[in-house]
Amino acid sequence: MPARTPRRTTRTAVTCALLVAATTGLTACGGLTPGGSSKSAPSAGPVSTALPTGSATLTVVSSENAGTTKALAEAFHAKHPNITVDFQYTGPDDYDKSLNLKLSSDQAPDLALLNKLGTTVKGNLVRSLDDYARAYGWDAKYPSTELDQWRAPDDGKQLGAGHLWAAPAGFSVVGVYYNKDIAAKLGIQPPTTPAEFEAALAKAKAAGELPVQLGNLQGHSSFIVQSIIDAADGAAKTGDWVNGKSGATLKSPGGTAAANTLADWAKKGYLPDGANGTDLPGSVADFTKGKGLFLFNGSWDAQKIDRAMPGRTGFLTFPSESGKATGIGTSVAYAIPAKAKNPDLAAAFLDFMNTSEAARIQFDTGFLPVAHADTVKGADGSVMNEVAKGWAAVNKDNGLVNFFANTDATMNDTLTSQGQQLIGGKTGPEQYLDALQNDWTKGHQ
C-alpha cells in the first residue's frame, strides 16, 4: 500500500478498498446512496473476449488516488493503442454519495470502483461477472478467497458465495512486522509456530524490550485477535464468520485462544502502557523508533516503515500449527455497471489486472499483486520483499480472510470498545467473545 497512514482502519476504511491505504482516499465508504436503483438489470447477453479493432474509449470511475488504476490504464493503452482509458477520479465522500446515481444513469461508466456490495447488487446496478470469469478462466487464475470477497447472491446480503460482482485490482494484507535489530540482539529467529512466537515475547520482556507495539485507540487489537483466530481455525472457518454464514461463531478453539491471549499479553506487560490511548500512526511511529519487537499491521505502512528503518525490519504471517499461511486483507475492486456501453472491453481490462505486467504496477504503487506475487521484487533489503513473500504464501494456501470489522455495520465499534476493555482488565475473554458474537448475530438476522 502507499506509504500513507490509514485515517481509520474501520469497517468503512477497510471496506473501502481497504485501508488499502487509507489515504488512497478510500476511507469514507458509508452506505451508498439508495437512490437510482433500477428494478431490473438489462439482459447481459453473450460475452466476448475479443477486443475492438477500431478506436474505442473505456470509461473508469474511481476514488482510488494512489495512482494504481491510472498506471494500469496507461499500460493497457500502451498495449492496445486504439483503446483510450478515460480515468475519472472523484474524492471518496462525493464518490460514495453519487455512485448509485452514476451507475443507474444512461451515461453509466464502463467500470466503477466498488467499496462494498449491497445496494449496488440488490438494485441491479452492476452485472454479474460469472460469464466473464468463465471466459477468461479467472477461477484458475485467482485463489478462491480473493474472488469470494466479491461474491454474493442477488440480494447482496451474505458474502462469499453466489455471483461474482467485481474483480480485484490490488490487495493489502495484515501480518506481523518485527525489528531485526532487537531480534538479532536477543537471538530470536522469525517464529514459525505459535509456541515460538510466545517464547519470543517472553524473551523480549525478560530483556527489557517491549514485546508487542500496539495502538488501540481505534480498535487495532482486532488485528492481533483475528490473526490468531485465522491461524488457529483456518481461513475457511473464519471467512464464513466474516461473510455472515448461518451458524458461524467465534466461540471456537481459535476464538477462545485469541481472547485469552490478548488478555494474557496485557497482564504480562507485553503491550505498551497507554495502548488504548494511542492510534495506529502513533504505534507505527513508536515501532520505527525501536519501541517493540513486533507490530501487527498492514502492508499499507510497509514503505513508511522501510524509510524509517531501512533494511532493519522483517515481516511474517502469524504462524499456525498447521503450517498454512493466513492473512487479513481485502482489495480495491471494480465492477461493470449493468448499463455499461462496453462491457466486453471492461472485462478485458479487468483481466489485464491479473497479468505479470499489472503485478509490477500494483506492487510499485503500493498494492500487493492480484496474481504473480512471486515475480515482484523491491529494493534489496526492503521489507516489501518479505511482505510480498508472505502474500504469495497466503495466496498459495488460499488463506486470505476479510477484516472482522467488515462483517456488519457495528462490528468495528464493538471490536474497539471490547478490545479496550479486555486490555484494560474491565472485561474477560469470554465476555469479549460474547459481545462480538452478539453483535454478529444482530447484524446477520
Regions found by a protein language model. Give the residues of each.
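Extracytoplasmic/periplasmic substrate-binding proteins
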Residues: 77, 224, 260-345
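Mature extracytoplasmic/periplasmic domains
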Residues: 300-303, 332-409
